[in-house]
Amino acid sequence: MSSFIDSIKSTSLSRALTIALGSNNFKSASTINDCKMGLYSSRLLAIPDNFSLVSSNIPSSDCSRAERTFNLILFAIVDLVICCESMAFFNLLLKLPSMLLVSFLTMLVFSISYSWSAFNWISFAFSSASFLMKACILFNSSFTWFGVKAVIAEDMLYRMVRGLFCASFVKQLQTTFLATAIVLC
């Protein structure tokens, strides 16, 4: 029977066995370490010399629970970020016609009629500045909307590969998008 265990240790199955060592809070990242064969030796001794039964006798929850939890958290965060981004961007697009119309009408009304020639240039300058500021905000927000998506995807991929996805990054994302939403609205 020991030769059976030795043969399993040398196969790819033994290298694939992992155990998740996580914490109850999300402040520290979960780590995935290789399983010790001693943890499963009592289960392996009861198995006949049939290699296909080895993986079915080892509980799958030990090896994949951390990965499933990580994926659920990751997808929930990505969904939340995309939803907040989309809502802020589309709210701005819905307000765009009214912003442009009000700016144009203000510029037209206060610079041409109901004013003197000296006041004409002052009101025209203020209206033009307001119009340019709103156009600049729209341009920057649309650029940020597409640019931030790429940066977030790249950063999440990097952290996912390195296994460093943790609550501080989530808090940073929430703070960033709250600030963006406040500025846009």
From Swiss-Prot:
Transmembrane segments: 70-90, 92-112, 119-139
GO cellular component, one term: membrane
Keyword Kinase assigned: no
Keywords, comma-separated and alphabetical: Membrane, Transmembrane, Transmembrane helix
Extracellular side: 91, 140-185
Top-level taxon of origin: Eukaryota
Membrane topology: Multi-pass membrane protein
Topological domain ranges for the Cytoplasmic compartment: 1-69, 113-118
Compartments where located: Membrane
Any further remark recorded for this protein: Almost completely overlaps VMA4.
Protein name: Putative uncharacterized membrane protein YOR331C
UniProt organism field: Saccharomyces cerevisiae (strain ATCC 204508 / S288c)
